[in-house]
């Protein structure tokens, strides 16, 4: 009985594999680059992390507003700065006045409250908190302008030649 089941499963597997092979051959798929990817985003880029080879791009050089992807750079600069100064993410910081009431998505920070850098990072990345971005910029950079300069410098170091940040949260800015 077990032998019969094994033969049946093997036969089905072979038939499926052959069917896929015929389908691929019939439709002319010879390699992964010939497959059209349906991406609804305006821009896209897929890169091999090991080699740096660009595997797919869609309007990669077209100017676009960074929106909340800005928050990724805010998190990166924050994490690298904390590591550089050997500061624990659990370190408590005081929320600056300018972080209270920032428009858009928020973690509802109150000026003067104490919160850990780690919690600000969670609020930044999980809730997309614009107020958390402003608080981190003020705390890490001394002010938002200097922090944005740090972000742009880091982007340049990473090879982002056409990238320009105007604020730490990605809210609309003509720049």
Describe each region flagged by the PLM.
Residues 14-25:
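Hydrophobic alpha-helical membrane-insertion segments, chiefly the h-region
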Residues 26-175:
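Active-site-adjacent loops and short helices of periplasmic peptidoglycan-processing enzymes
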Residues 1-13:
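N-terminal Sec-pathway targeting helices
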């Amino acid at each position: 009985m077990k032998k019969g089941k094994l033969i049946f499963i093997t036969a089905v597997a072979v038939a499926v594999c052959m069917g896929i092979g015929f389908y691929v051959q019939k439709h002319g798929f010879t390699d992964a680059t010939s497959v059209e990817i349906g991406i609804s985003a305006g821009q896209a880029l897929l890169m091999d992390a090991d080699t740096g080879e660009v595997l797919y791009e869609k309007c990669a050089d077209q100017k676009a507003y960074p929106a909340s992807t800005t928050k990724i750079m805010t998190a990166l600069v924050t994490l690298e700065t904390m590591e550089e100064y050997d500061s624990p993410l659990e370190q408590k910081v005081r929320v600056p006045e300018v972080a209270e009431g920032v428009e858009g998505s928020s973690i509802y920070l109150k000026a003067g409250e104490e919160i850990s850098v780690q919690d600000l990072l969670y609020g930044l990345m999980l809730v997309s908190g614009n107020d958390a971005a402003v608080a981190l910029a003020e705390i890490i950079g001394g002010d938002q302008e200097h922090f944005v300069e740090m972000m742009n410098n880091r982007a340049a170091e990473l090879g982002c030649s056409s990238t320009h940040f105007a604020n730490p949260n990605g809210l609309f800015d003509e720049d």
